[in-house]
């Protein structure tokens, strides 16, 4: 039998939609897993090292100014009521406090490394302060 060319014709009759099987319908209605993108997870320690490099580059203050100011005023109220501070005085106190804390954590890290650890512990902090000659 010879082949004949078929041409597209517009359908005149309206067909009723077929009912889908329950399993097939459930698969179609379920969200596609490819559409939801999971957040990228870095390996443990990668973000910490990035933060260390970031904060070693910067020279700005690490503690927020207003909470530190409230802390200074709260401690000063215990000593003497009705005491005033210049903004430069609080800024100088904050610079000194941050320099002290950074140095203390450096010494604490050295104590942890001396104990063949990479995680600092309270005993490292106590040892660093003891070597410095501070009370705790």
From Swiss-Prot:
Residues covered by region (Disordered): 1-41
DNA-binding listed as a keyword: yes
GO cellular component: nucleosome; nucleus
A Pfam entry, by short name: Histone
Transmembrane portions of the chain: none
The keyword DNA-binding appears for this protein: yes
GO molecular function: DNA binding; protein heterodimerization activity; structural constituent of chromatin
Location in or out of the cell: Nucleus; Chromosome
Principal location listed in the UniProt entry: nucleus
Induction description: Up-regulated in the absence of H3.3.
UniProtKB keywords: Chromosome, DNA-binding, Nucleosome core, Nucleus
Family, per entry: Belongs to the histone H3 family.
Biological role stated in the UniProt entry: Macronuclear replacement variant which replaces conventional H3 in a subset of nucleosomes. Nucleosomes wrap and compact DNA into chromatin, limiting DNA accessibility to the cellular machineries which require DNA as a template. Histones thereby play a central role in transcription regulation, DNA repair, DNA replication and chromosomal stability. DNA accessibility is regulated via a complex set of post-translational modifications of histones, also called histone code, and nucleosome remodeling. Functions redundantly to H3.3.
Subunit structure: The nucleosome is a histone octamer containing two molecules each of H2A, H2B, H3 and H4 assembled in one H3-H4 heterotetramer and two H2A-H2B heterodimers. The octamer wraps approximately 147 bp of DNA.
Name of the featured protein: Histone H3.4
Annotated source species: Tetrahymena thermophila (strain SB210)
Gene from which the chain derives: HHT4
